[in-house]
């Protein structure tokens, strides 16, 4: 099936089979599809609704083309990532949570990119924090193994995705490619917290991750529209564990945190995001920093739990709070920045 035939199917609201979607995705990754065709596919799938088979097949092909790092032997290896596209422009919760999860004894291999439909993607924020992302594969692996936290800048690992970069940037909408980012971690990670831009995606993404061989995953979307666990509203969760998917709803009060509005947590850019995160992770927090810290604890707790550090999510949230208030997280961030700086200098020499 070629991409024109696929588009014809999609306009009739017909889902593509896994073999059909694999064929289309390969044509994109090999540079055979035009930008107009890729843009039409993005919009068509978005309007039809991406099926489990379409997402699974596209992710499988993208993984096939990825430049990989093999750290799958590491215990408690986890990624916490959002699809983006929620349009809320909050500070970068998942990136802040990564450092808390790493300080808890898990290992983070965080797959991320620059903001496409938000003002602060994980890569934008990390560069503001002085963390170098333009590392080679060996250096990135050293970060993960020696520092317990490493960042996999998507364009370094998914070179073939360059063909979709133009349409993604020009359309500026959430699309199947937002969904594929979290599904295509190139480091062999099998434990994830994945935030999605619609609660209708929670179970389907959990189903996709099951087909892709994941072990323990929480897929989350909050009732106030966030692609993370919210401080201000209940959060819908689809949890894949031991091959079974269960769906549940989380209220902050369930784990001893008082619900609060998100006022003060919206940021203009990566600089403002970093400033708020440093406030939240410091020992002397402002009122807004305190609120951000609670938001981070809810999300870092999910990562600590799926990593297998604690037996329950509630225990993990308490552990995350202890780490945040103990000040270890900021130290983790600054040590990683220094380590990546040293790696870059040795590369230059």
Swiss-Prot record:
Subunit structure: Homodimer.
Residue numbers binding Mg(2+) 2: 227-228
Record bears the keyword Zinc: no
Keyword field: Amino-acid biosynthesis, Aromatic amino acid biosynthesis, Glycosyltransferase, Magnesium, Metal-binding, Transferase, Tryptophan biosynthesis
GO molecular function list: anthranilate phosphoribosyltransferase activity; magnesium ion binding
GO cellular component, one term: cytosol
Protein residues bound to anthranilate 2: 168
Similarity field: Belongs to the anthranilate phosphoribosyltransferase family.
Cross-referenced InterPro entries: Anthranilate_Pribosyl_Tfrase, Glycosyl_Trfase_fam3, Glycosyl_Trfase_fam3_N_dom, Glycosyl_Trfase_fam3_N_dom_sf, Nuc_phospho_transferase
Protein name in UniProt: Anthranilate phosphoribosyltransferase
Major enzyme class: transferase
Residues that bind Mg(2+) 1: 94, 228
EC number: 2.4.2.18
Binding site for anthranilate 1: 82, 113
Classification via HAMAP family: TrpD
GO biological process, one term: L-tryptophan biosynthetic process
Necessary cofactors: Mg(2+)
Residues involved in 5-phospho-alpha-D-ribose 1-diphosphate binding: 82, 85-86, 92-95, 110-118, 122
Function in brief: Catalyzes the transfer of the phosphoribosyl group of 5-phosphorylribose-1-pyrophosphate (PRPP) to anthranilate to yield N-(5'-phosphoribosyl)-anthranilate (PRA).
Catalytic activity: N-(5-phospho-beta-D-ribosyl)anthranilate + diphosphate = 5-phospho-alpha-D-ribose 1-diphosphate + anthranilate
Pathway stated in the Swiss-Prot or TrEMBL entry: Amino-acid biosynthesis; L-tryptophan biosynthesis; L-tryptophan from chorismate: step 2/5
């Amino acid at each position: 099936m070629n991409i024109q035939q696929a588009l014809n199917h999609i306009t009739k609201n017909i889902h593509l089979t896994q073999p059909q979607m694999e064929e289309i995705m390969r044509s994109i990754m090999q540079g055979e599809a035009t930008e107009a065709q890729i843009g039409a596919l993005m919009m068509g799938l978005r309007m039809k609704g991406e099926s489990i088979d379409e997402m699974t097949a596209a992710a499988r092909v993208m993984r096939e083309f990825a430049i990989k790092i093999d750290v799958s032997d590491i215990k408690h290896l986890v990624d916490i990532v959002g699809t983006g596209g929620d349009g809320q422009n909050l500070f970068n919760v998942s990136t802040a949570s990564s450092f808390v999860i790493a300080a808890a004894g898990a290992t983070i291999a965080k797959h991320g990119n620059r903001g496409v439909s938000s003002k602060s993607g994980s890569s934008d924020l990390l560069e503001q924090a002085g963390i170098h992302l333009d590392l080679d594969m060996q250096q990135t692996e050293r970060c993960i193994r020696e520092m317990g936290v490493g960042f996999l800048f998507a364009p370094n690992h998914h070179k073939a995705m360059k063909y979709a970069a133009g349409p993604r940037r020009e359309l500026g909408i959430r699309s199947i490619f937002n969904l594929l980012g979290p599904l295509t971690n190139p480091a062999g990670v099998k434990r994830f917290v994945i935030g999605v831009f619609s609660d209708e995606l929670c179970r389907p993404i959990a189903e996709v991750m099951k087909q892709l061989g994941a072990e323990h995953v929480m897929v989350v979307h909050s009732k106030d529209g966030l692609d993370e666990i919210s401080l201000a509203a209940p959060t819908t969760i689809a949890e894949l564990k031991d091959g079974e998917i269960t769906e549940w709803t989380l209220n902050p009060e369930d784990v001893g945190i008082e619900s609060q509005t998100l006022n003060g947590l919206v940021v203009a850019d990566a600089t403002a995001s970093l400033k708020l995160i440093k406030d939240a992770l410091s020992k002397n927090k402002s009122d807004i920093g305190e609120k951000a810290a609670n938001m981070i604890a809810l999300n870092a707790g999910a990562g600590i739990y799926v990593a297998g550090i604690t037996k329950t999510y509630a225990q993990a949230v308490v552990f995350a709070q202890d780490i945040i208030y103990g000040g270890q997280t900021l130290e983790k961030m600054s040590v990683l920045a220094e380590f990546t700086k040293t790696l870059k200098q040795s590369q230059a020499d």
